[in-house]
């Protein structure tokens, strides 16, 4: 069984844009185990994404802040798995070093840093036709699997307690709620086109 590590300690939207990568890995390796390293604030975002089996919380602002915090995180997880590959979103140097220390056999990231790039198993990336961030994230899987990237929609498993919260608090005394989505961001590469919205 393959075991993968996905590292993204960015913000809410960035986490969601990583989901197609997780889904692509599961599409190619359906029986694999995928560990997602997330910042504490957005751990629930990762926890309920399709394709994610386990979430490790990297509390970069408190518990795991700085070099000592980095080392403590490593000690907490150092013998948990033997990772076949790690996928580091946005070429995060901390994620690359951590993946190496955790023993990932292959590491894929988009980093142009001269010294850090030596730790990667991919050459500088040419995304070709992939210009949207979620597709570029997914392309990292192709570098490992050699299976062509498929532009997958994001899929999120909303927990039942979230529905209960919305019903009891947010929709209290509202008989006909309206839900609006705003798929537009300040960066065109992150905008969600109609078929790319959650399914």
Short names for language-model regions:
Residues 1-199:
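Catalytic machinery of carbohydrate-active enzymes
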């Amino acid at each position: 069984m393959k075991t993968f590590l996905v590292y993204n300690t960015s913000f809410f939207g960035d986490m969601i844009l990583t989901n197609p990568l997780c889904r692509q890995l599961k599409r190619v390796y359906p029986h694999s185990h995928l560990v997602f390293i997330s910042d504490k604030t957005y751990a629930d975002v990762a926890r309920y994404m399709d394709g994610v089996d386990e979430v490790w919380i990297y509390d970069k602002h408190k518990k795991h802040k700085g070099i000592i915090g980095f080392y403590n995180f490593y000690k907490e997880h150092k013998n948990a798995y033997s990772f076949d590959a790690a996928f580091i979103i946005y070429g995060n140097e901390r994620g690359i070093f951590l993946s190496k220390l955790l023993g990932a056999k292959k590491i894929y990231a988009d980093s142009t840093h001269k010294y850090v790039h030596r730790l990667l198993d991919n050459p500088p990336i040419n995304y070709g036709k992939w210009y949207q961030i979620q597709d570029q994230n997914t392309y990292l899987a192709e570098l490992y699997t050699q299976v062509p990237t498929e532009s997958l929609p994001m899929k999120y498993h909303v927990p039942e307690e979230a529905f209960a919260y919305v019903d009891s608090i947010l929709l209290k005394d509202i008989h006909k709620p309206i839900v609006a989505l705003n798929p537009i961001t300040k960066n065109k590469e992150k905008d969600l086109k109609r078929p790319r919205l959650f399914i």
